[in-house]
């Protein structure tokens, strides 16, 4: 992915204008980017303004101080003094600080905002420009014969560490980093809470490599402060099937967002992936970067309306009482699809045939082997639920699946967690999709979920409104790294990333 030689252009992306993030971005610092879409659902439209401070510089220093683990390099803005005796150098320093502050743009949430945005990091990468009209298909850069062997340089005071997630203490460290610093909604009310068991499922599919679990630690005390991951996947893009990686879990500790660590993390995981002969990647982000292949929207279906209102995940509609809202979202106690049962190991071959055949109709979709199907779909408590539909003659005709991803509820006296089910892959050949997804809601409700989330990809638009989903307030963009192809509509996306 990122260039394996540090050119002047790529080095520029580590200067003051580049900003670190939590989520795939590389050009934004103080905002927590929504790599998954906001866990706040209906919330998250507002941006938080954050105060910035700046360390004092020596006059005529000619540049910034070097990075260190203890130097926050925050920007402090002072009002210009009305005293005419204030030294000219002081006024110039103030003016420069104000210019730097104005240059620190917030993340672009839509194409209009993105058109005005500067992407100093992504402009150095093999991705299409936002205004580029694309009609061709293929790699932007050819595969490289000589890949950089040495890791990229981190700011002073930090060190690389490959995380061995089979070590319970290391896994706990990663869980803590993500739990305290990963994606949250703009109002700081909800934050994704990936369990250690979920992380093992998401980060260790068939073909996973230890070196693709890339961490950053403070050199002095070995505290884990940054992470990025890659997992292998065969992805079909229109008519081409490519071995690539899915990039996920880019996270930088909140106190180190001014260190420009995110661009280095992206470059380093790129180098490590390139060393294995892979030169394409797919990733998602809640912000607009150069250049989305597709834009999807999250929808939310209330399963526990009382709790969702109490934690302010959702709000009562005008002229609606809580009792009427609870009645509106009430579900049957039992499913109605005949032959619906949990997936078992004996179903792996049939499920693989169902999913690979069904996904051929989409422009962006995985191609799975039996080992991958077993990993991603065999039920695991509190991680993944898959139910198949078996006909009277023993043939599997359909299946539904959803994964578990709770969010921590911040600042609430009673509720500490919001249990969310996320629609995964739902394949139908005989059962109407509307009936299949109605049963998915009933099953999720019976398992204690508070909300059921789904993107408007694949055929999901056919059931979202009918099953009383409400539209979310944020988009999820899909991106390809080092691959150029025309964009597509959300209903032609057949890929779901955790």
Curated annotation (Swiss-Prot):
Keywords carried by this UniProt record: Acyltransferase, Cytoplasm, Membrane, Phosphoprotein, Transferase
Composition bias type Polar residues, residue spans: 61-86
GO MF term list: glycylpeptide N-tetradecanoyltransferase activity; peptidyl-lysine N6-myristoyltransferase activity
E.C. numbers: 2.3.1.97, 2.3.1.-
An individual GO BP term: regulation of opsin-mediated signaling pathway
Residues recorded with modification Phosphoserine: 38
Record-linked InterPro entries: Acyl_CoA_acyltransferase, NMT, NMT_C, NMT_CS, NMT_N
Comp. bias (Basic residues): 45-57
Subcellular compartments: Cytoplasm; Membrane
Annotated stretches, region: Disordered: 1-88
Chain intervals with Acidic residues compositional bias: 15-32
Binding site for tetradecanoyl-CoA: 117, 122, 250, 252, 258, 260-262
Membrane topology: Peripheral membrane protein
The reaction(s) this protein catalyses: N-terminal glycyl-[protein] + tetradecanoyl-CoA = N-tetradecanoylglycyl-[protein] + CoA + H(+); N-terminal glycyl-L-lysyl-[protein] + tetradecanoyl-CoA = N-terminal glycyl-(N(6)-tetradecanoyl)-L-lysyl-[protein] + CoA + H(+)
Entry GO CC: cytoplasm; cytosol; Golgi apparatus; host cell; plasma membrane
Family: Belongs to the NMT family.
Its biological purpose: Adds a myristoyl group to the N-terminal glycine residue of certain cellular and viral proteins. Also able to mediate N-terminal lysine myristoylation of proteins: catalyzes myristoylation of ARF6 on both 'Gly-2' and 'Lys-3'. Lysine myristoylation is required to maintain ARF6 on membranes during the GTPase cycle.
Name of the protein in its database record: Glycylpeptide N-tetradecanoyltransferase 2
Organism encoding this protein: Homo sapiens (Human)
Gene from which the chain derives: NMT2
